[in-house]
Amino acid sequence: MTKTGVYPGTFDPITNGHLDVIKRALKIFDELIVAVAMSSYKKTPIFTVEERVHFIAQTTKDLKNLKVEVFDGLLVNFIKEKKAVAIVRGLRAVSDYEFELQLAHANRRLFRDIETVFLMPSEEYSFLSSSLVKEIAYFGGSVKSLVPPIVEKALRNKFKK
């Protein structure tokens, strides 16, 4: 039986921290699905879902046993459809843990058979978030060491002044 993990997020945009989690999750699961959320009730993404999928697909094209798919609605419904055994989440700090623990409990309540696997980022990415990347790029700072080259270029174009 193939053990499939799902790494969900908006990935707006994907960062080197996300890539770190993806590569490490692939060591645990037979297959990993990067599940790109179509939309979020929290905020409007700066990149379309198609752009976000493209960025992820391009930066992970050399990784085996990885799929990039879009989902909309409840994550647990996507998990059931894909017959996945676990949700993969990155934890940077205690504040992440509190929020992620609530999500894990809610997902477990909705689908009793799902597990959540928390992965700590490599130390160099422990501060990194998509929001931080967007803010730095918006104000003209360099995000070269924080995101893949395709994303850096897209951010520069998006925030040209």
Curated annotation (Swiss-Prot):
Gene Ontology biological-process entries: coenzyme A biosynthetic process
Keyword Magnesium: yes
Molecular functions per Gene Ontology: ATP binding; pantetheine-phosphate adenylyltransferase activity
Annotated transmembrane regions: none
Co-factor(s): Mg(2+)
Location of this chain's protein in the cell: Cytoplasm
UniProt xrefs under CDD domains: PPAT
One cellular component term from this protein's GO annotations in UniProt: cytoplasm
Top-level division of the source organism's lineage: Bacteria
Entry EC number(s): 2.7.7.3
Function: Reversibly transfers an adenylyl group from ATP to 4'-phosphopantetheine, yielding dephospho-CoA (dPCoA) and pyrophosphate.
HAMAP family per record: PPAT_bact (MF_00151)
The protein, known as: Phosphopantetheine adenylyltransferase
Organism the protein comes from: Thermodesulfovibrio yellowstonii (strain ATCC 51303 / DSM 11347 / YP87)
